[in-house]
């Protein structure tokens, strides 16, 4: 079953190898799909042991597994703790919704890193070409302190962003990629 799903995924994503036919890739916020989009990877790792999964993937001549997790979790400024006024319904609903999601996100990121670490520990003992796993975790909260960090953490969830917010997020992405050691290791592995 897992092998059939892998073949289906491979066929579905093959067209993205043609940059002229499909020059753009639009991604969906993982929180909208399955909490960071990592759930399917983690489900797969729970169904098969690392040993079985490694053996299956060796059949496809893979050399690297690279997962780039972009955690765009915001931190909207609110000042409810600065006033004796009872918080409004919007503040209460945001708290009730965001706290459990934030905790699940944190747990998923930790589990994903643990999976990559376990995978790489297993492959150290393998002979020949190895399949290395890289888990690149980029979080807006890891930006250096300053106006850009404050601005991007206060961008609300939306299906449309004004160009000024897009520009700030691109600048933030560049900084996060530049400061990520794991990203640079993964990039080097692809060369």
Predicted regions span which residues?
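Soluble non-transmembrane domains of integral membrane proteins
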Residues: 1-7
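C-terminal helical/tail subdomains of lipid-metabolizing enzymes
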Residues: 8-44, 48-191
């Amino acid at each position: 079953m897992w092998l059939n799903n892998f073949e289906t995924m491979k066929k579905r994503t093959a067209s993205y190898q043609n940059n002229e036919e499909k020059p753009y890739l639009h991604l969906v916020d993982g929180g909208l799909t399955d909490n960071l989009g990592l759930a399917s990877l983690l489900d797969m790792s729970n169904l098969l042991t690392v040993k079985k999964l490694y053996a299956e993937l060796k059949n496809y001549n893979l050399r690297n597994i690279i997962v780039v997790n972009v955690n765009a979790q915001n931190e909207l400024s609110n000042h409810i703790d600065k006033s004796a006024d009872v918080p409004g319904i919007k503040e209460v609903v945001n708290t009730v919704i965001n706290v459990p999601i934030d905790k699940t996100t944190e747990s998923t990121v930790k589990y994903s890193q643990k999976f990559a670490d376990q995978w790489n520990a297993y492959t150290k003992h393998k002979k020949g070409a190895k399949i290395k796993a890289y888990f690149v975790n980029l979080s807006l909260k890891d930006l250096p302190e300053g106006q850009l960090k404050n601005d991007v953490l206060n961008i609300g969830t939306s299906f449309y962003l004004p160009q000024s917010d897009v520009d700030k997020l691109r600048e933030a992405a560049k900084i996060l990629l530049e400061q990520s050691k794991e990203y640079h290791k993964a990039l080097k592995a692809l060369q």
